[in-house]
Amino acid sequence: MNIFNQLKQDIIAASQKLYNNKEIANTATIETPKDSFNGDLSSNIAMIIASKESIAPREVALKFKEVLVTLPYIASIEIAGPGFINFTIKAESWQAAIKDILQHEEKFFEIDIDKNSNINIEYVSANPTGPMHIGHARGAVYGDVLARILQKVGYSVTKEYYVNDAGSQINDLVSTVLLRYKEALGEPITIPVGLYPGEYLIPLGEILSKEYGNKLLTMNDVERFKIIKSFAVEKMLDLNRKDLADLGIKHDVFFSEQSLYDKGEIEKTVKLLERMGLIYEGTLPAPKGKVHEDWEYRVQKLFKSTNYGDSQDRPIEKADGSWSYFASDLAYAKDKIDRGANHLIYVLGADHSGYVKRIEAIVKALGQEKVKVDVKICQLVNFVENGVPIKMSKRLGSFASVQDVNKEVGKDIIRFMMLTRQNDKPLDFDLVKVKEQSRENPIFYVQYAHVRTKSILSKARELMPEAYNSFKEGKYNLSLLSSEEEIEIIKLLAAWTKTLEASVKYFEPHRIAFYLINLASKFHSMWNFGKENSDYRFIIENNKELTLARLALASVIQKIIASGLEVIGVEPMVTM
């Protein structure tokens, strides 16, 4: 029995019985109270019903108590505060969760949520101008893990990378590669400020010199630019794909911004919005802090993004008459929707936090309020080595690339550590600490718990083969798992699917890392108790029955740690 799911179903049934309304109960929460004095589980259903029915919350809570207290898995119910209903669950019901996980693993891990959305999640989308720096790794891991979680629970998900191959930085890339090409032909060069001085572009110049000789120098500017751009962008994308693949990340679609221009998609989108009455000619107010006299008021085409919650309408043309970046964003969103997506998720860096409202406006307008949109911001990573910050700049030619850090610590450490803080909070990544074998290193602590649980099972097979075979046959008495420490671990194990569900509901994959760290901590505490008191050991050679029960506990801990690590794309370690 999944206690969380069962209690939710029983609350829904009680809501139908008492108030003829089971739909409202779907909005109620079931949480684990921070203070154990408030029971094992708590629900806000009484306050939700009270608000709708104009009844005192405690009165509603008392009615729910009368109905629910008779349930066979409930030990007691208390009403707290303004109307929270706090449940204490019988120990045998928690213990039964262990049996359910071992005997009905796939069913236990199922999550009952609406899965009708066709989700397009765009993440990374770094400019293809060089090796991917570690600053992009956080958004890459966050987006990839979120996509994995959504897929695990049954959503249709497209993982997409938007290739910014139509902007000024691409022009700078082409100019730099042209200089490296000339250098390969023997011409002395100087890389001007503003271009890309990194040595990673030298091989591109050498390849072009071998393929074209000096022919590119005699071509007209337009033809030469086109050849170098196509070549350089593809090479940089290959580099980025490899960097991502080395992190365990693979996108389904790489979508070219330039293709929107080449296929006339921007013009088509603008005409559509004109027919919808959402494009007009007008002027924009001076930006905040700009002196009025210094601001040039110019009549231009604007999109009515304020109709959809944006702070101001957005220009779709630049001063020279070319399309603005916003115009290509409009066409790109339309393309996603035309491909069948009805829920768009954008994962952006901290430097794009000002884009949230305008992106929401784009999707609301083009989706005609029928397409969901979520914009998630990943804050900066403070990347240090021995306490010294590492500068990250492609233009300076000195930066810590994803490849550099991957070689130093490995993909699993990068993936896990990028989830050790909520995505919208800054993250400190210390290269020294992540390689330590101590409880201060969360990835080591979790992996060590997995290794230890595996070793418990291996040791039992070696020392107590008869008992081990009985365990494999399901012959264990789980009521023996009755100590406070064991019950606390079991409660946490039973909350695994609840954690996964919350990660999906709130788009917060860090909850999984936090859960694994918490589970590892409780397991290691019990392991250490066993060093001081033999009664707490997992294998007690003169107590077969208790050993059987604890083998079941160790097995479930191992399965859930492995499941959690696999969800976030980290390989569970077997030995250390």
Curated annotation (Swiss-Prot):
<comment type="similarity">
    <text>Belongs to the class-I aminoacyl-tRNA synthetase family.</text>
</comment>
<dbReference type="InterPro" id="IPR001278">
    <property type="entry name" value="Arg-tRNA-ligase"/>
</dbReference>
<dbReference type="Pfam" id="PF03485">
    <property type="entry name" value="Arg_tRNA_synt_N"/>
</dbReference>
<dbReference type="InterPro" id="IPR008909">
    <property type="entry name" value="DALR_anticod-bd"/>
</dbReference>
<protein>
    <recommendedName>
        <fullName>Arginine--tRNA ligase</fullName>
        <ecNumber>6.1.1.19</ecNumber>
    </recommendedName>
</protein>
<dbReference type="GO" id="GO:0006420">
    <property type="term" value="P:arginyl-tRNA aminoacylation"/>
</dbReference>
<keyword id="KW-0067">ATP-binding</keyword>
<dbReference type="Pfam" id="PF00750">
    <property type="entry name" value="tRNA-synt_1d"/>
</dbReference>
<dbReference type="InterPro" id="IPR035684">
    <property type="entry name" value="ArgRS_core"/>
</dbReference>
<dbReference type="GO" id="GO:0004814">
    <property type="term" value="F:arginine-tRNA ligase activity"/>
</dbReference>
<dbReference type="InterPro" id="IPR001412">
    <property type="entry name" value="aa-tRNA-synth_I_CS"/>
</dbReference>
<dbReference type="InterPro" id="IPR014729">
    <property type="entry name" value="Rossmann-like_a/b/a_fold"/>
</dbReference>
<dbReference type="Pfam" id="PF05746">
    <property type="entry name" value="DALR_1"/>
</dbReference>
<comment type="subunit">
    <text>Monomer.</text>
</comment>
<keyword id="KW-0030">Aminoacyl-tRNA synthetase</keyword>
<dbReference type="InterPro" id="IPR005148">
    <property type="entry name" value="Arg-tRNA-synth_N"/>
</dbReference>
<dbReference type="GO" id="GO:0005524">
    <property type="term" value="F:ATP binding"/>
</dbReference>
<keyword id="KW-0648">Protein biosynthesis</keyword>
<dbReference type="GO" id="GO:0005737">
    <property type="term" value="C:cytoplasm"/>
</dbReference>
<keyword id="KW-0963">Cytoplasm</keyword>
<dbReference type="InterPro" id="IPR009080">
    <property type="entry name" value="tRNAsynth_Ia_anticodon-bd"/>
</dbReference>
<keyword id="KW-0436">Ligase</keyword>
<feature type="short sequence motif" description="'HIGH' region">
    <location>
        <begin position="126"/>
        <end position="136"/>
    </location>
</feature>
<keyword id="KW-0547">Nucleotide-binding</keyword>
<dbReference type="InterPro" id="IPR036695">
    <property type="entry name" value="Arg-tRNA-synth_N_sf"/>
</dbReference>
